[in-house]
Each structure stands twice: as C-alpha cells, then as structure tokens.
Amino acid sequence: MVVYGHTPELFGGALAQAIVNAGKARTDLSIPEAFIRGILCNILVCIAVWMSFAAKRVSGKLMTSFWPVMLFVLCGFEHCVADMYFGVAALLTSAEYGIAAEGLTWSHFLFSSLLPITLGNIVGGAGVVGVGYWLAYLKHTPYAKETVEEEQKELDIAEEY
C-alpha cells in the first residue's frame, strides 16, 4: 500500500531512496550477524511481553512493553516482522521506481536476511526466554509433574473404555 499508494514519491523521491537504503542495510548483514541480532531482539521482545503480563494496569503494560522494544530498536537488533516490512518495501520500491540497489533481490532477502533472523528470533524467544522461564519456575514444581501424571492416568482410563 505504501509503495503503490505513491508515498515514496514524497520529498522529491528522497523517501523512495531512504526506503531502499533501509532495506538494503538490513539485507547486507552476514548470516551469523543476522542470526545473533535476531536472538538478542526476540529476547527483548519476549521479556516485554512477559513483563506486560505481570503488570496489572494498562499504563504498566504500556511502560513495561515500551522500554525493551525501544532498546532493541536503539541497539539495531533485527526482528522478522519488521524485516518483512522493510525488506519487501525496499524490493517493491526499487522495482517500482527504478532505484538500483546492488544485491537487493528476493532470494537474497529471503535466504540471507529473513531466514536467519527468523531462526534467531525463535532461538531467542523459545530457547532463551522460554527455557529460562521453565528453569526458573516450572522445572522444580511438583504440581506440574503431578498434573501431567494425573492427566496421563485419565487418558489411560479413557482408552480402556
């Protein structure tokens, strides 16, 4: 919508050039760098989500979400959802307005940028934050083990009938 709504034509085409430059900068990362930036980003995003769950008021939810997200933006970390916008906007703007950007192709964007960032986001969110919370709160909880065992007994009884 942004590209085909002719928004990049604003400011004499400078906005189109800025969109392409932003997308190109995101796709110029090496695969390990993109992966690590993805891990660090989603650690902060997941912490923001968990902190907002802990807050009771809307103002607390907003404030606890704001700071980690602001930090990941300031640090230049990468999130796959943001990359889906910036990369696609850059590719479409480049094609629509004829702005040359060496190395900015769909395959390079998908496999050298979006894939490692997405995998990094998964590792950061599920691997670091998820496992961290499990180790901190659920690993040594006898209730969780008993609940699973009780559910398994109920399933075994149900299978007998």
Predicted features along the sequence, with ranges:
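Alpha-helical transmembrane segments and their helix-helix packing motifs
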Residues: 1-161
